[in-house]
Amino acid sequence: GTLNLGMGKQKGDAIAPSGKTVTITSRKMDADPVLITKLFERGKHKIGYLMYTNFTKTFNTSIVKAFNEFKEAGITDLVLDLRYNHGGDDDASTFLCSAIVPKEKAVVGTLLSKETWNSPCQKIFESDPQYENLLNRFFVETNCNLDLPSQKVYILTSGETVSASEYTIACLKAFMDVELVGTKTYGKYVTM
């Protein structure tokens, strides 16, 4: 929408109308969650650094661009900064995992994760004919799998590492070596 604001000037303890009006129009803005990408070299290691602030599948193309640049540079190691990532879309998390887990393990269509709920909820899910798709996540095609030689990822964490970030950490731990650097995550998932 549009909003017209009447401007004023401070006169003592009050604000007096200046007669000027400013019109502002709202606009939806989506910030790219790939906030920073950098390359570092330490000895024989070429390190790709990615600060990722929110899991938003509309920006998977930003992951593709960053990871293809990392691949072109020949990175040996990845530092994934999730310190200020409050989570987001599970599909974006699945995409990111599919791009990081080594190729021989990240086979498109194979199981990435399986959710298990308490007994009453689990029974409700399992009564749905599509429950496999409700509780399970599968590797997807990314066209940017890093296939890191070390099969290890370093993840920077903080108390603001929440939800889909923690889910991503848990999924990556199941398929490769993950070294957490930082403080305890928020604790919505079991990766604390």
Regions found by a protein language model. Name each.
Residues 1-78, 84-86, 91-92, 98-105:
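Flexible, low-complexity junctional segments that flank or bridge functional domains
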Residues 8, 51-55, 81-85, 111-115, ...:
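Active-site-proximal beta-strand/loop segments in catalytic clefts of secreted hydrolases
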Residues 31, 45, 56, 144, ...:
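Residue-level recognition of alpha-helix boundary/capping or hinge positions
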Residues 32-34, 90-152:
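Gly/Ser/Thr-rich loop/hinge elements
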Residues 65-72, 99, 139-144, 170-173:
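Mature extracellular/periplasmic domains of secretome proteins
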Residues 102-109, 173-182:
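Bacterial peptidoglycan biogenesis and beta-lactam-recognition machinery
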Residues 149-158, 166-170:
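A conserved active-site cap/scaffold subdomain adjacent to cofactor or substrate pockets
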Residues 188-192:
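Short, charged, surface-exposed secondary-structure boundary motifs
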